[in-house]
């Protein structure tokens, strides 16, 4: 469920349409997008916008109950993981899956948001919560 305002119309539409347990992926510039899944390409140049910048906007604007991350981020991008985890509220469930599983999960997300991030395993699936 949406909490605030996003200026990008495609991002706003996805946030508006998220229901409880719906998912959206924010990915680095190399993450493949499955055929038939909406792709919102925000990449301007290598590194812009960053994964963290786009994640911040979504965390400010949607209620997240669960996230999925590639297990490989622990060894291959620990700094990105550390920063990311500090942004989550204590009640957000964190689930680690293989990178291959994360890519397969993208077949069922509402959209994949492509950033300019060029560090490994900077991909996350956000699962929408509900404010009751």
Swiss-Prot record:
A Pfam family annotated for this UniProt entry: RbsD_FucU
Record-annotated membrane-spanning stretches: none
SUPFAM superfamilies named in the record: RbsD-like
GO (cellular component) term, any one: cytosol
Parts forming coiled coils: none
Primary location: cytoplasm
Stored InterPro entries: D-ribose_pyranase, RbsD-like_sf, RbsD_FucU
The protein's Enzyme Commission number: 5.4.99.62
Quaternary data: Homodecamer.
Gene designation: rbsD
Localization per record: Cytoplasm
Binding site for substrate: 28, 99, 121-123
Reaction(s) catalysed by this chain's protein: beta-D-ribopyranose = beta-D-ribofuranose
Family: Belongs to the RbsD / FucU family. RbsD subfamily.
Protein name, entry field: D-ribose pyranase
Active site: 20
UniProt function note: Catalyzes the interconversion of beta-pyran and beta-furan forms of D-ribose.
Species per Swiss-Prot/TrEMBL record: Lactococcus lactis subsp. cremoris (strain SK11)
Keywords, comma-separated and alphabetical: Carbohydrate metabolism, Cytoplasm, Isomerase
Lineage: Bacteria, Bacillati, Bacillota, Bacilli, Lactobacillales
